[in-house]
Amino acid sequence: MALIDNTFLRQYELQVNDDLAIIEYSLQDRKIFLTKLIIPESVSDDNFTEEFLILVLEDIRDREISVVPTAPTIAKFIRKNRKYKKMLPVGILSLIHI
């Protein structure tokens, strides 16, 4: 699985068979706002979603920028996987109840 950061469309993409999994984002200063998660029905299982989120969050961590998860599924994933908590900007923890 090859993760693509499509900067023109401001989204992460992952090709799955004939479908595309997408996380839309907005980049502001040194923060990336993850605004929408789209998982194709053909692979809509929790394992795939988690793998996709891990790929995206690892890419963001490598770029050393903060992440603001505005999409509920992504915020829930970060709540559940505390190793990504360090990527959140100061002050955001209480907003997403982490």
Listing of model-derived features with the role each one plays in the protein:
Residues 1-11:
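Active-site rim helix/loop that mediates acceptor-substrate recognition in acyltransferases
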Residues 10-20:
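Conserved beta-hairpin
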Residues 20-42:
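A short, structured beta-strand/loop element
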Residues 44-58:
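Conserved acetyl-CoA-binding loop-helix of GNAT-fold acetyltransferases
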Residues 46-47, 91-94:
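Compositionally biased terminal segments of proteins
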Residues 61:
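Anion (oxyanion) recognition and catalysis
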Residues 66-90:
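C-terminal structural segments of small proteins and small subunits
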Residues 96-98:
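Conserved small/polar residues in nucleotide/adenosyl-binding loops
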